[in-house]
């Protein structure tokens, strides 16, 4: 039996399905080390995401407000390619990129509806990290 020959190149990866979603939710998780922006449809399925490290920042530069701005702009551009126009923003975490990320979502062209702070507050749960001595 002769060996089978393949014609054409093999395709790897998943195909990107364009969704046409007009409004959704933007979740901004801003920690002391990084900022992650996820944009979802109203049901919670992720349409686009970006983080400071994903945009190209490394090390301590990931925690800067400028890195958060670039991550939010990248996620907003990808979401607008899917037809996103309006987002409700949910911010979590104590990081420095919170306000900058919200501002850059609106300057990228998304209309920002409501802004909610959903940072979890412990009812005296885990012991916090020790104080830094510099």
Swiss-Prot record:
A GO CC annotation given for this chain: ribosome
* UniProt entry keywords in alphabetical sequence: Ribonucleoprotein, Ribosomal protein, RNA-binding, rRNA-binding
Question: Which superkingdom is the protein from?
Answer: Bacteria
Tell me a Gene Ontology molecular-function term this record carries: rRNA binding
TM segment ranges: none
The cross-references to Pfam families, in alphabetical order and at most eight, read:
Ribosomal_S11
GO-annotated biological processes: translation
Q: Which SUPFAM superfamilies match?
A: Translational machinery components
Q: Which NCBIfam families match?
A: PRK05309.1, uS11_bact
Q: Which PANTHER family match?
A: 40S RIBOSOMAL PROTEIN S14/30S RIBOSOMAL PROTEIN S11
Q: What does this protein do?
A: Located on the platform of the 30S subunit, it bridges several disparate RNA helices of the 16S rRNA. Forms part of the Shine-Dalgarno cleft in the 70S ribosome.
Q: Which family does it belong to?
A: Belongs to the universal ribosomal protein uS11 family.
How is this protein organized at the quaternary level?
Part of the 30S ribosomal subunit. Interacts with proteins S7 and S18. Binds to IF-3.
Instruction: Specify the protein name.
Output: Small ribosomal subunit protein uS11
Q: Name the gene.
A: rpsK
């Amino acid at each position: 039996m002769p060996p089978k020959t393949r014609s054409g190149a093999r395709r790897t990866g998943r195909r990107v399905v364009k969704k046409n979603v007009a409004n959704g939710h933007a979740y901004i998780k801003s920690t002391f080390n990084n900022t992650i922006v996820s944009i979802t449809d109203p049901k919670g399925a992720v349409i686009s995401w970006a983080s400071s490290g994903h945009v190209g920042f490394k090390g301590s530069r990931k925690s800067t407000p400028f890195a958060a701005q670039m991550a939010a702009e990248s996620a907003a551009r990808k979401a607008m390619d899917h037809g996103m126009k309006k987002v409700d923003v949910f911010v979590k975490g104590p990081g420095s990129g919170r306000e900058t990320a919200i501002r850059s979502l609106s300057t990228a062209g998304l209309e920002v509806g409501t802004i909610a702070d959903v940072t979890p507050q412990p009812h005296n749960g885990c012991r916090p990290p020790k104080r830094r001595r510099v």
